Amino acid sequence: MKAAIVVFPGTNRERDMVHALKLVTGQAPRLIWHGETSLGDLDLVVLPGGFSFGDYLRSGAVAAHSPIMRDVKAFAGKGGHVLGVCNGFQILTESHLLPGALLRNAGLRFLSQDCHLKVENASSPYTQGWTRGDVFRAPLAHGDGNYTASPETLKRLEGEGRVAFRYCGADGAVSDDDRTTNPNGSTRSIAGILSENGRVCGLMPHPENLTDPEIGATDGVPLFKGLVEALVG
């Protein structure tokens, strides 16, 4: 699988993503600087976590206008696969590759903790490694992770099965108003969503940080293994 990770000033999770992808593919992905204008021949583009351009204006707002994002948009427009994690999810919404927005966390403070996610759609390349209803653990680290969208957009996301992950308790229970299960206050506990064709995915927690048993756990491995199976077979 030919993958590349886009690096912006302030990105800090690209090496974690390299490690996760290398574990499941056997080869390191390319790193592409934001100032470049061409992605080249790829199967997957990843926008990793961090604080691109210091989160000035809004998280992801400046990065969305970087030169490389023109080709990322073109790649997605042709049916290419794009994964955005944390700041990458914010960049995807700012680029209008995914609907909605990520607001300041409900508690108005930065969160760095583990959370549990419930798989809502197991038929996309990003979720096919799980079964619908599965619950897994993932770390989160963000100040602007509170997902919101218009009522019409939310209805469309739910109706089209485009909610990929929801925040939940360890038992899978979802409670929008419970900050122990929905820590940032996201609308309908939404943690990750898909594009209309299912090929663009954004989520706030970091599955790449739980892919190696030597550094904690392997809860995030199904996402990456599912991608390899979907894109390479």
UniProtKB/Swiss-Prot annotation:
Pathway: Purine metabolism; IMP biosynthesis via de novo pathway; 5-amino-1-(5-phospho-D-ribosyl)imidazole from N(2)-formyl-N(1)-(5-phospho-D-ribosyl)glycinamide: step 1/2. Transmembrane segments: none annotated. It catalyses: N(2)-formyl-N(1)-(5-phospho-beta-D-ribosyl)glycinamide + L-glutamine + ATP + H2O = 2-formamido-N(1)-(5-O-phospho-beta-D-ribosyl)acetamidine + L-glutamate + ADP + phosphate + H(+); L-glutamine + H2O = L-glutamate + NH4(+). Part of the phosphoribosylformylglycinamidine synthase complex involved in the purines biosynthetic pathway. Catalyzes the ATP-dependent conversion of formylglycinamide ribonucleotide (FGAR) and glutamine to yield formylglycinamidine ribonucleotide (FGAM) and glutamate. The FGAM synthase complex is composed of three subunits. PurQ produces an ammonia molecule by converting glutamine to glutamate. PurL transfers the ammonia molecule to FGAR to form FGAM in an ATP-dependent manner. Keywords: ATP-binding, Cytoplasm, Glutamine amidotransferase, Hydrolase, Ligase, Nucleotide-binding, Purine biosynthesis. The gene is purQ. GO terms for cellular component: cytoplasm. This is Phosphoribosylformylglycinamidine synthase subunit PurQ. Its main location: cytoplasm. GO terms for biological process: 'de novo' IMP biosynthetic process. It is found in: Cytoplasm. It comes from the Bacteria. Its EC number is 6.3.5.3, 3.5.1.2. NCBIfam families: FGAM_synth_I, PRK03619.1. It holds the Pfam family GATase_5. The active site is at residues 86, 206, 208. Residues 3-233 form the Glutamine amidotransferase type-1 domain. Part of the FGAM synthase complex composed of 1 PurL, 1 PurQ and 2 PurS subunits. InterPro entries: Class_I_gatase-like (IPR029062), PRibForGlyAmidine_synth_PurQ (IPR010075). One of its GO terms (molecular function) is phosphoribosylformylglycinamidine synthase activity.
